[in-house]
Amino acid sequence: GMITTATYGFWFLANGHYSFASISLCLSSTLVGFIYYNFSKDNKIFMGDTGSLILGFIITTLTVKFIHFNVTHTFKIDGLVSAPVVSIALLSVPIFDTLRVFYLRIMRKKSPFKADRLHMHHLFVDNGFSHMQTSFMFYGYTIATSSLTYFLRQYLSNTELCVFLIGLFALYIILGNILEQKRLDAKIAS
């Protein structure tokens, strides 16, 4: 969320949408505070379900406005015909994780809304990565995917960019399966 809201914030700022820039950059700054405290050994802040839902609602609203402004307005910087695909790239971690987890739960005849440890961050932590390492892997992935999608938009159509993101989703699923199998193997061995 921090990278996505910061990206939207700077884009809104560069294009004169100051109210949305303020919302985006304030939210991004707030999330930096969460990261600061949650990576310390002594202090922790728990956002909870309500905080996560509000965060998701605000990011969804900012995403809709980002796409809308790219379709309907004149810009100080180049307009993004590929704004929907760039938004998907910015939000690929939660989108991919939700799709993967819902699919696995349904295939296992469980409610897609019942909590479990199938989320990718649980798989990384259960395989020996720290919370900090896992978080920075997700940050790096989000920055790399978004930057690459933004760069490739000059050379590829939106359809080709979608195929690129579907390929990344396939790799995400494969990685999740590998991590889940390693977790099962470790459980059996112990």
Where are the regions a protein language model picked out?
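Alpha-helical transmembrane segments
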Residues: 1-127, 131-190
